[in-house]
């Protein structure tokens, strides 16, 4: 049976098309909603906080009174934090900065109970550095997920260049021989956003989403990213998952997290994964 892992997240550029403080206030609203939703809905299992622990500081700067509520959700494994301190452009920062970024992310995670997500998270980096597998392995991390670097399909499953891997899963190797499991967001990191609750819309939605994911996945574990840039929390997701499970008896839909997803992917990996070496440079924007 295929398993659809729906991972809720938001990708938070702290300053982009709006000034920092406007993005900051939108982020506070998102986090307020997330905490309230998780406390009220125990079926809303987990939220991936974009791989950057600085978001904890950003929230508590405005809502220091909510630290205990936030920390409990982190300690319970429901809000997943780290490994980085901040999501970086890997080619604009120095090598030492990339090392310190990981160290600072780990240190801050310890202040919130020590549940540090051991996933090298590069959702929207404009290319990935060749020594990332080496750095991650030194930190005890053996898996990386990323959106760019090996010609992902992008929005609406459109491929503009030849794909460089047989599957969305691959071996990614540094020059020193260090290797991690690499997982590409082959249908981007919004391929499970705004899941419909109503049956007819849900059927139309999942027919396409499942077909797109199966096209690239090497296992029966399918990844659906329930979020996008500055995406609010989908507060009715639990109902949407119940609808999907009723519609597709041959697929198990679960509200998941990267730790559980990767653990199950590793059990089913085929022997013919491609090995991608060094820098991942396709689909970068300079």
Language-model segments: what does each one mean?
Residues 1-284:
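Catalytic-domain carbohydrate-binding cleft regions of carbohydrate-active enzymes
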């Amino acid at each position: 049976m295929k398993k659809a892992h729906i991972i809720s997240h938001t990708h938070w550029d702290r300053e982009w098309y709006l000034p920092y403080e406007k993005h900051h206030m939108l982020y506070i609203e998102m986090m307020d909603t997330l905490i309230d939703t998780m406390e009220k809905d125990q079926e809303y299992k987990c939220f991936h906080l974009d791989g950057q622990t600085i978001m904890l500081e950003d929230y508590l700067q405005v809502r220091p009174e909510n630290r205990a509520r936030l920390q409990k959700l982190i300690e319970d494994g429901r809000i997943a934090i780290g490994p980085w301190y901040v999501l970086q452009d890997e080619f604009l920062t120095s090598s030492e900065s990339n090392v310190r970024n990981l160290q600072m992310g780990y240190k801050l995670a310890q202040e919130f109970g020590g549940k540090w997500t051991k996933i090298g998270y590069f959702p929207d980096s404009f290319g990935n550095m060749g020594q990332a597998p080496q750095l991650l392995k030194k930190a005890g991390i053996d898996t990386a997920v990323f959106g760019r670097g090996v010609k992902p399909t992008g929005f609406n499953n459109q491929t503009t260049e030849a794909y460089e891997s047989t599957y969305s899963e691959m071996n990614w190797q540094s020059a020193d021989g260090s290797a991690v499991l690499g997982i590409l967001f082959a249908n981007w990191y919004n391929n499970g956003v705004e899941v419909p609750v109503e049956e007819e819309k849900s059927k139309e939605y999942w027919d396409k989403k499942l077909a797109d994911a199966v096209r690239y996945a090497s296992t029966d574990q399918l990844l659906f990213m329930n979020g996008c840039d500055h995406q609010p929390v989908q507060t009715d997701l639990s109902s949407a998952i119940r609808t999907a499970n009723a519609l597709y008896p041959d697929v198990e839909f679960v509200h998941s997290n990267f730790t559980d997803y990767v653990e199950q992917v590793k059990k089913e990996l085929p022997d013919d994964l491609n090995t991608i070496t060094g820098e991942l440079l396709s689909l970068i924007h300079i």
